[in-house]
Design a protein with these regions (language model features):
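Short, compositionally biased leader-like segments
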Residues: 165-203
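Two-metal-ion RNase H-like nuclease active-site motif
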Residues: 204-208
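Active-site- and interface-proximal helix/loop "cap" or "latch" segments in soluble metabolic
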Residues: 2-164, 210-297
Length: 297
């Protein structure tokens, strides 16, 4: 049976994430994420090094509202020394356990790791003379500043790179994201809103994400009687490389008539993710599926 523990006793659920990055005076950044839903709110703040280390230098958290266990927040400093790479989500889950509010704290930590992939600290000489509108130059800086970008999505694949020079490509990337001034506050800000709406025998899933370089608004509709996705739509108002990032967005339609089962979480990796897909489209969809209880086929 398709459902969601977050819809228990209600037909609508909304979760809001707000995150931002402050540039420290050394090599590290401070990433702060707040997540709020009808049952409470939490905040996680990690001081981390940029790519390639992604090392947590200091960690803190707090309960902002609701019944989340403050003991989880008290344990967050134990993350110091952890790297935000493969296995970080498991480390967060182990830290938080099954205590009240653990889900929000874990998800906030994961969002911090995602913020860390949006900013870096290259030498000032690397951005000297950079024209913010020079998409090719920004793309090259991307693959220099973040070691995990190559082949992470279509744009950073050889096929995506080959499209430069064949069509107009624009970018909102700016020098501050590559080499920010020491102590600069909120050099990158992000807001995400996930929403579940139950309407008769249809379950609507919404997820939006807006930040300095992305603008996504996703909608899926699940027919609960048939157990399949009957609508899949996305509006992209801002992309890191408009003209190239647009290419994989149509892959969202590959989810039409897909069974809404537990295996869908794995199938979307090849349907909308990987080197032929879009990492943000995949993450936004995967996060919606995490909110659901899905049957095993």
């Amino acid at each position: 049976m398709i459902g969601s523990p977050f819809l228990a006793g209600r037909d609508r659920y909304e979760r809001v994430m707000e995150g931002w990055v402050d540039s420290g005076h050394g090599e590290a950044f401070t990433h702060t994420v707040q997540i709020t839903d009808p049952d409470g709110g939490v905040e996680v703040s990690l001081v981390c090094t940029p790519s390639p280390g992604y090392e947590v230098r200091a960690a803190g958290a707090r309960v902002r509202s609701g019944a989340a266990d403050p003991g989880i927040a008290a344990d967050f400093p134990d993350l110091a020394g952890t790297r935000m790479v493969g296995g970080f989500g498991k480390r967060l889950a182990e830290l938080c356990g099954v205590r009240s509010g653990a889900v929000l704290f874990v998800d906030a930590g994961i969002e911090v790791a995602r913020l860390a992939r949006q900013v870096t600290k290259l030498p000032a000489a690397a951005i000297a003379g950079l024209d913010p509108g020079d998409a090719v130059a920004c793309w090259r800086l991307d693959t220099t500043g973040w070691v995990d970008l190559p082949d992470s999505c279509f744009t950073y694949s050889p096929a995506g790179h080959a499209l430069f020079g064949t069509r107009p490509v624009s970018t909102p990337m700016v020098p501050t994201l590559y080499s920010p001034p020491p102590g600069a506050p909120k050099i990158f800000t992000r807001k995400k809103v996930a929403r579940l709406v139950l309407t008769a025998r249809r379950l609507h899933l919404f997820h939006s994400m807006h930040d300095n370089v992305h603008g996504f608004d996703l909608h899926y509709e699940v027919d609960l009687d048939r157990g399949v996705i009957v609508a899949a739509d996305s509006v992209t108002s801002r992309l890191p490389y408009a003209g190239i990032c647009n290419e994989p967005q149509a892959r969202i339609k590959s989810l039409l008539e897909q069974p809404a089962d537990a295996q869908l979480r794995k199938r979307i990796q090849s349907l909308i993710g990987g080197s032929s897909g879009c990492a943000q489209l995949y993450d936004l969809t995967a996060d919606l599926l995490k909110l659901l209880s899905l049957p095993v086929s």
